[in-house]
Design a protein with these regions (language model features):
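N-terminal presequences and immediately downstream first alpha-helices
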Residues: 1-15, 40-50
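N-terminal regulatory/effector-sensing and dimerization cores
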Residues: 20-100
Length: 100
């Protein structure tokens, strides 16, 4: 994941998120563990799919257009390649992304 529009690139260069670890799993698949708090993230047609799983926290994390749906440990979110979304991250959270 190196493109500026990628979800990985947005988190790495355009947010307060901290990358804990990343691994190339082969066949165009990458996994990354992140932590974040007091931030916003905006994704616009990243060009790849992202499967996101909350590991810790995230109880107040939500999409700006869906303010009543929150994250929590074990919850899963799918971000399709051509989607657009804007996220509000208030309290500390830890999550894993699978990019493909």
């Amino acid at each position: 994941m190196t493109a500026d529009a990628s979800v990985f690139g947005t988190l790495a260069r355009g947010s307060r998120a901290a990358l804990e670890r990343v691994a190339n799993l082969g066949d165009g698949v990458t996994a990354a563990v992140w932590r974040n708090e007091h931030d916003e993230a905006h994704y616009s047609q990243p060009g790849h799919h992202t499967l996101s799983v909350y590991l810790q926290g995230g109880y107040t994390t939500h999409r700006q257009d869906l303010p009543n749906l929150f994250g929590a440990p074990g919850r899963v979110c799918m971000l399709p390649a051509e989607h657009e979304s804007a996220w509000v991250i208030e309290q500390p959270m830890r999550f894993v992304h699978l990019y493909f």
